[in-house]
Amino acid sequence: MARRFIDISMHLENDVPSDPPGLSPKISYIDHQMSYPDLAQFFPGLKKEDLPDGEAWAVEDVQLNTHNGTHLDAPYHFASTMDGGQRALTIDEVDLNWCFQPGVKLDFQRLPDGYVVQPDDVEAELARIGHTLKPLEIVVVNTRAGTAYGSAEYTRAGCGMGYEATLYLLERGVRLTGTDAWSWDAPFAYTAKKFAETNDASLIWEGHKAGRDIGYCHLEKLHNLQSLPAHGFYISCFPVKIKGASAGWTRAVAIFDDALQAGSP
């Protein structure tokens, strides 16, 4: 089989709701005509008509935070410590071996928005797809949020991975996970309601906080996971190397290649 790629990243773009209000990326586009003054300052005497087609260059000014778009969260995002008290890794310190491994997809599209996934749900889905987890496999979760992308409901859509479900994966050697939802955890609107009823702060970000016990990374805001089979592919998701940061943007892709699969354990 020839090597084939499926893009599982979302665009960074203006005017598409992928973050809560006030947190979205802002991109300014400067085209080949607009940029002439910037080019001319390097070359005194240059006239616009001297340039081929009268064009300079295209460039963009981008205002982002490290959690805009498809990105990889480092253990440092979840807490200052990991592995029971060790200093948490920042994104530039994450083991790159974690970021290129066989992928496994858990299909939780049927679960309602705000549902908190438990170990039994993970076990049932693994049984359904006939797969036993192996260390370092990248486990991605396909939620209803995938089909909500592009709408105002995106950040409130999809189920979330609970503390125990996350530990279930980590205890089996998984070190990198992912979701097509805004967050690995259930949407805040649902968790806020539970917190108001119980005053139990352990419910807040419970899946993320599993990283305090066993350090791991997760991808958020993946896209197009419905195009993937349950297994039989690799995922590549190397993060941008930002010094001391809690996350890095990534162009996550699924790779289908017989030679790669033959070499996997």
Where are these regions (language model features)?
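Active-/binding-site microenvironments in catalytic and ligand-binding cores
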Residues: M1-P265
